[in-house]
């Protein structure tokens, strides 16, 4: 009986070896195909983030545009709002999109904000011929104030003191100023908000004083300089 059992075991074990080899080969082939044929992730199916550079070394960790943060759409369902300071890792285009949903009548209209950003990026590409992501990064770098003033003292004696601005607040304030400038320019104007946002980003990227964000940044830095 023992010999019969051994023969049965051998008959079941022998054909298993080539099957395992075939399965291993197919797994290796699928892994090779998946690693070599990964498609490039482009924003809205058009804009690549490979050639985008952040020239300000202090903001490189707070402007997320590298391949790791590449998305087809600027929407992550609030993933970066769960913890404090996690928004620093949020893709910069999504932060711009979320800032466009300001004022009560626009709350929660993410699809409308995505459409505005998409149209403004197409306008930027038509006017400049450059990657709109690079224009956005340059606009944020130029619009973030490096110095601000704060109130110091108690109720009786209050004075303003100039302070340096952290990199995260520079990015936050730059995005807010850019969106505010676009919103105010589009109010009671024949231009759409996508056109106004495109103009604001292009002027801010150039450092032009026609940009609302650049004017406000210069004003904040001028007040801070007088309070040193």
From Swiss-Prot:
A GO cellular component annotated for this chain's UniProt record is: ribosome
Q: What is the lineage of its organism?
A: Eukaryota, Metazoa, Ecdysozoa, Arthropoda, Hexapoda
Q: Which Gene3D superfamilies match?
A: Ribosomal protein S7 domain
* Family to which this protein belongs: Belongs to the universal ribosomal protein uS7 family.
An MF annotation (GO) of this entry: structural constituent of ribosome
- Domain of life of the organism encoding this protein: Eukaryota
Task: Name the keywords, alphabetized.
Answer: Ribonucleoprotein, Ribosomal protein
InterPro entries, per the entry: Ribosomal_uS7, Ribosomal_uS7_CS, Ribosomal_uS7_dom, Ribosomal_uS7_dom_sf, Ribosomal_uS7_euk/arc
* Protein name according to UniProt: Small ribosomal subunit protein uS7A
Q: Name one GO biological process term.
A: ribosomal small subunit assembly
What NCBIfam families does this protein's entry cite? PRK04027.1, uS7_euk_arch
Query: Where does this protein come from, organism-wise?
Result: Drosophila melanogaster
């Amino acid at each position: 009986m023992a010999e019969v059992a051994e023969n049965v075991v051998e008959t079941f074990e022998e054909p298993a070896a080539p099957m395992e080899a075939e399965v291993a080969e197919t797994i290796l082939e699928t892994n090779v195909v998946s690693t070599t044929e990964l498609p490039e992730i482009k924003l809205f199916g058009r804009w690549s983030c490979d050639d985008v550079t952040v020239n300000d070394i202090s903001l490189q960790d707070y402007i997320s545009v590298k391949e790791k943060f590449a998305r087809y759409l600027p929407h992550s369902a609030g993933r970066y709002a769960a913890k404090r300071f996690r928004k620093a890792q949020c893709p910069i285009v999504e932060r711009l999109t979320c800032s466009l949903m300001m004022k009560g009548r626009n709350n929660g209209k993410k699809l409308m904000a995505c459409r505005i950003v998409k149209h403004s990026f197409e306008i930027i590409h038509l006017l400049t011929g450059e990657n709109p992501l690079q224009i956005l990064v340059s606009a944020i770098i130029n619009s973030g104030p490096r110095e601000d003033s704060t109130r110091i003292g108690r109720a009786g004696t209050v004075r303003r003191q100039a302070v340096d601005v952290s990199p995260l607040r520079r990015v936050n304030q730059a995005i807010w100023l850019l969106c505010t400038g676009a919103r105010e320019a589009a109010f009671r104007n024949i231009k759409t908000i996508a056109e106004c946002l495109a103009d604001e980003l292009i002027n801010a990227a150039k450092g032009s004083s026609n940009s609302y964000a650049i004017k406000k940044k210069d004003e904040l830095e001028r007040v801070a300089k007088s309070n040193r």
